[in-house]
Amino acid sequence: MESNNVEEVTDKFGGCLSLDTEKMGKYDRYRQKGKEAALNGELPRALELFQLAYQLQPSEKLKKRIQAIQDLIQREDEEDEEEEEEFVNVNNSGLKLYKGLYDKLYDHQKEGVAFLYSLYRDGRKGGILADDMGLGKTIQVISFLSGMYDAELANHTLLVMPTSLIKNWVREFAKWTPGMRVKEFHGSSKTERNRNLERIQRKGGVIITTYQMLINNYEQLGSNGHREFKWDYVILDEAHKIKTSSTKTAKSAHAIPAKNRVLLTGTPVQNNLREMWALFDFACQGSLLGTSKTFKTEYENPITRAREKDATPGEKALGLRISQNLTDIIKPYFLRRTKADVQQKKLKLEEGFEEEEDQENKCPNAREGVEMPSLTRKNDLIVWTYLSSVQEDIYNKFISLDQIKELLTTTRSPLAELTVLKKLCDHPRLLSQRAVIQLGLERGSDSELVHSDESESAVSQIDNISDHTLIEESGKLQFVVSLMECLREEGHRTLIFSQSRKMLDIMERVLRNRNFRLLRLDGTVTQLAEREKRISLFQTDKRYTIFLLTTQVGGVGITLTGANRVVIFDPSWNPATDAQAVDRAYRIGQTENVIIYRLITCGTVEEKIYRRQVFKDSLIRQTTGDKKNPFRYFSKQELRELFKLEDTRSSSTQQQLQAMHAQSRRSDTSLDHHIARLHSMEMFGISDHDLMFTKEPAADEDDPEDAESHHYIQTRVQKAQELMQAESELHGQLLDSMAQNTEPAWLRQMGQPNSSIRDRPAPPRIKNEPVTVDLTHNSFDEPEFEEDEQNLPSAEDAEMETASEDVEVIGDEDLGDKVISSEVEVVGEEVEVVAEEVEDAGEVEVVSEEVEGVGVEVEDVGVEVEDAGVEVEDAGVEVEDAGVEVEDAGEVEVVSGEGQVQPKSPQSGGEWNLQIVKTEVSPIAEKFADVITLDDTSDEADSSDFNTESKQQNSSQRFQSPSLQFPKLDDLSGASNTLGNEEVEPEKCHSQVLSSPLSQHEATTDEPFKAEMEMPHGNFNLLLEDSADMYFPEDEEVHEVEESAAEESPEFQLQMDVSGERLEEPSINHDKQNNGEFVNYNDSEVSKRESLLKIRSTPNESVDDSFVHSVRTKKRQVISDTEEEEEEEEESEKPCLTSSPFIDAISRLGSSTPKAVLVDGARLRRSLNASVASRRSFVVSLLENESDEESNEDKTKSSGASETCADELVEEVQTSSGDNSKSYETSEANGTLADELVEEEGEYREGKNTSDKVSESNETHSEEFAEEEKPSGDKSESYEISEASETHTDNSEEEIIGDHTGSYKISESSEADESVVEEEEPSGETLNTEESEMGEEEESAELIAGQEQEEWHSAVLESTGDVELDSNETMDQCAPKTVPVETHVLPVSSTNTAAEASDNKYNLLVLSGKQSLAEGRKQEALDFFLKAIDINTGDPEIQLLIIQLYRQLSQ
């Protein structure tokens, strides 16, 4: 009877189980499909599926999700009705702009937005918005981006600007487009920078960075992971920073791939027309103005000559026609409006006149909307001051020196001498202390004279000098003091600009002693917050009457309309520099009339500088269209007389200008009284700078004299335009070809983990004559010389000129059929580099870009690369025509244990993307080198040691059929027993590392590299300098030669094959297609992140030739910043305290650029039709943040529900192990929907990366979970699920990091605390996700202890903004291995309450921390206590311990 009952109960129970299983399966399917539909924007379908799932198994979480979707659908319906009313077509250009934003724009700003859109609409690659300072270029760009993002015509924008403008741009974005995702790539926190960049590249938005950041990190900004990342828009503010194409700034900007480029500058031409050519060459990517040389010959020279006063009529006529032709060419790409233009247009509209020009972008409803405020009057006065008697005496002595006489007879630059003269005109104490003592201005002993620093200014020694003496020694200072007294009486506030900080020191002391309240801003104020504070204080507190600024810092991008008087203490060679300074006060928002005082000393070099300014200004006005034919004031001959001191009590320039313009001055009674008072001060006279070029030249002055001259001019203009057009087309074709067939050098190199060593390898020696490749082209550190020294090509042009590279073979005999033999012996093991024959052999391009922040050249390091066979004269090198031509880089696959490289696909045609094998150069120089060795296996017998031979002969050589093979090691002395058919055990490798003495780091210099290479026509060996940003200083502590030790084992081959299959799947990359254009080069079966075989040369050390092989986990490093390497090393030795409640505040305090709060996603706009400029978008952003916080609290509170969470975790893992669907990006939508949908994002990433490999958690949460997670294969792969923080937001994501042995970690990065784990976690420590916390009670201490050894070998590596690795890829370990210390883990009984689980975990962490502290491991103890304090924040004992540990570690 009992048996029957048992059977009956069993049957019923089995039936229930089967029903429950079927029901749960349907529930899972509905829920999963609902999430997919929601992420694809199919909200009604998602709602239906979620409702079906809710009927099967109701839950509060699902109910919230359904409610959120219903709210979104309702809002979408509401906005559909209002959509037509909310967006306006900007000036009928086709761009729809949010109405609330459109109505706030002035008419000229609407035209600017229409112009920017016309560039995109008409297929132009870029353009220049060159509006005068103060007309709102910032709001025009923000409005344009708002329309482009709303229309989903752009997703990714890179904004580059000077550091001082970042806060202003962030403020404007928050004001005008609160829903747009704007992040900063700036500040001291590399982690935050990386995270922000990765987020913008992945989700879309605007990333703001500075020019210095661009120089240091152009590689990272131009790539995402291993692929080139092409920005939709690259926008440069204050774009005259790239006016010289040979500078690092310009070259770095050229290196950023972009579909469209927009430049913003109020001064497109500052000194000469080549600067304008450089801007257009960048903006239009070389497709508009041809080459620099042609532009100079055909356009710049005729135009410049025509501006001189003594030009012949023919020259004037030619220059005028050429200038008009140039204006017509650039007109579609160039928009410039001055304040005067805007004011005149406004007056014409009021009077009923219509503007004829720019009909395309003209505002059709110009009289509607916001009215442009009237700008106040500006009087720009030149005040001609006297030299003091002391200044005049020193000036005469200096120009009579033999040094000056000799200078005038040579072609040497007189810049240094002119700088001395300029200082003399300002104040004699700006000279060096030594000069001041010699000139008798200050008493000093002979010993002081001998030991005084030549570069030290005498300003630092003015403490004992009276104010009266300081004022009497400078004529300008006498006038300034009198002027400030006058302006204080009249109630005006003043900006004083000087190019010299030391001059500001003198003025600050004198004025403060006269009871002036003043502020100061110069280059010593490095913190942005402090700069903003001072600017805001002056704008709001009228008690401060004077603001002292340096022209370089205070003259760009800031608004200081609180002042209505501006003093330019010393004129600049560049007229635009002074104009920028003036416009800090004279701009939109200024309500009072402005007076400018430019102080110039009579008869000195300053007068010559001013005349030169006027000449440059005429070029600017003519070329930019401000004036077709400006008046000619001076000739070039007059500009050369710089070292002549004329009458210091009068000025011929002032008299000339006064006679021409005195009657035209715009004035009133108060200004007349003020000028009369100025004449009573110590100065010669006044001229009107703002009236320059108001006089028109004679109407027939520039007409050609006869028909023949007219015909010549026409022919010359036509020829110039045709030549420039042909060059532009050729350059465009070359760009297209390079885009298809090449990739940036760092993309090939980034995938290779590298380490550095302390020792410097001996330069390789060769027996035969080496082939020398000239790699001096495209240098980042050395000037590029052409026929004209100022005609410097851009970096982009340099990369294009493949034909200019030449290969020189040095030798006394034909090397056509010979083999250049060389040896590569790496600690006793022979490395063979063999290559398969390539049918279509051609050209190999090898590019090694230098990190700009390092700036060390190969010559500086002292590496004799010439002896290696290749001359490398700088770090930014490019090898072209070197022998093998690769038109379409093929794919490479490791298909055998021998490691041979074979073409992956037949359509690749046997073409190759050559890998670079890295060798290491001395850390004394702290630089690195690439060694590319090619050889032919048929001539291995010819290999021999390198010997130095004299270079005798140069001849060009080419080769056609090189071969390439991955280096392999036949035997590893430290791990030979692991080869063959056995699997490499990481424990053995680590024991090798731990047991190896320091002598193993040292190898002999007597064993150089062995390599072989043969080509039909020549042989070469390249030693290239590599970028230093991909190495870590801490690697110097442990020198490990990493090599794929298991490549001959079946397991190794199996892993490679599996990874290849994964790579072929379309879902392998989690990046969405609409998140930017990714150009994926070399989708190799061998992943680029695969730890490629390294050949380490470690000479100058002991003769221990043993190999050390280990699996190393290393953080990927793409950023190269300006911090010292010592700081990086110190930082790397300290684990990031990610779980500390204080770390977020610390990181924010340490960063000068805190993150923006308001973010919004592209999907939100698609689903809601909400503009990023709308108020609703702003509210949605706030709601998202609130819901995220609530959701985080709920997750923390519900973490005790072990059964529910365990079920969900099992469900998530099942999804991840079986699902290969494409990854998705979460839209930052309203309510809890975004949070809950994003919770599942990690599933897709995990499923995508692992595919058939399912993970086995080292913290088994339940028996079911452990069973379901068994791998599909026979291999045992250990995983560790860790969590960077208990707090999560909607952007948390999972990534998988693997090593050679299949040991992986799954780590989850938290966005909430904005911190990451950069180093290995303390050994034995285990971190859980929320779901896994429930199962912690069921795990046994024995299981944890058994897995500690495996945990030790795979470090917990958190996301630092880099793209996740694929399943077969590895990273090198940064820090030296330490012997793991077992952590005592207390077994805890099974319980269902969250409180008990938290208490158990808390006690466990406290006990582990105290144990570590007792054993002297303070850092590990601190980590444990920080995690404990996150659980129980009120324990005073732990708080005290944390504070004590922080103090001890900081010391």
Curated annotation (Swiss-Prot):
InterPro entries found in the cross-reference section: Helicase_ATP-bd (IPR014001), Helicase_C-like (IPR001650), Intein_N (IPR006141), P-loop_NTPase (IPR027417), SNF2-like_sf (IPR038718), SNF2/RAD54-like_C (IPR049730), SNF2_N (IPR000330), SNF2_RAD54_helicase_repair (IPR050496)
SUPFAM superfamilies registered for this protein in UniProt: P-loop containing nucleoside triphosphate hydrolases (SSF52540)
Domain Helicase C-terminal: 479-639
Key words of the record: ATP-binding, Cell cycle, Cell division, Centromere, Chromosome, DNA-binding, Helicase, Hydrolase, Kinetochore, Mitosis, Nucleotide-binding, Phosphoprotein, Repeat, TPR repeat
Ranges of Acidic residues composition bias in the record: 781-804, 1035-1050, 1121-1132, 1310-1341
GO terms classed as biological process: cell division; DNA repair; intein-mediated protein splicing
Residue numbers spanned by region Disordered: 647-669, 778-804, 935-1006, 1035-1054, 1063-1083, 1096-1140, 1182-1343
Modified residues (Phosphoserine): S961
Enzyme class: hydrolase
EC number in record: 3.6.4.12
Motif (DEAH box): 237-240
Binding site for ATP: D131, D132, M133, G134, L135, G136, K137, T138
Gene Ontology CC annotation, any one: kinetochore
Gene Ontology molecular function terms on file: ATP binding; ATP hydrolysis activity; DNA binding; DNA translocase activity; helicase activity
Reactions listed under catalytic activity: ATP + H2O = ADP + phosphate + H(+)
Pfam families found in the cross-reference section: Helicase_C, SNF2-rel_dom
Polar residues compositional bias, start-end: 944-964, 992-1002, 1213-1230
Subcellular locations according to the entry: Chromosome, Centromere; Chromosome, Centromere, Kinetochore; Chromosome
Role, per record: DNA helicase that acts as a tension sensor that associates with catenated DNA which is stretched under tension until it is resolved during anaphase. Functions as ATP-dependent DNA translocase. Can promote Holliday junction branch migration (in vitro).
Recorded family membership: Belongs to the SNF2/RAD54 helicase family.
Protein name: DNA excision repair protein ERCC-6-like
Organism, scientific name: Danio rerio
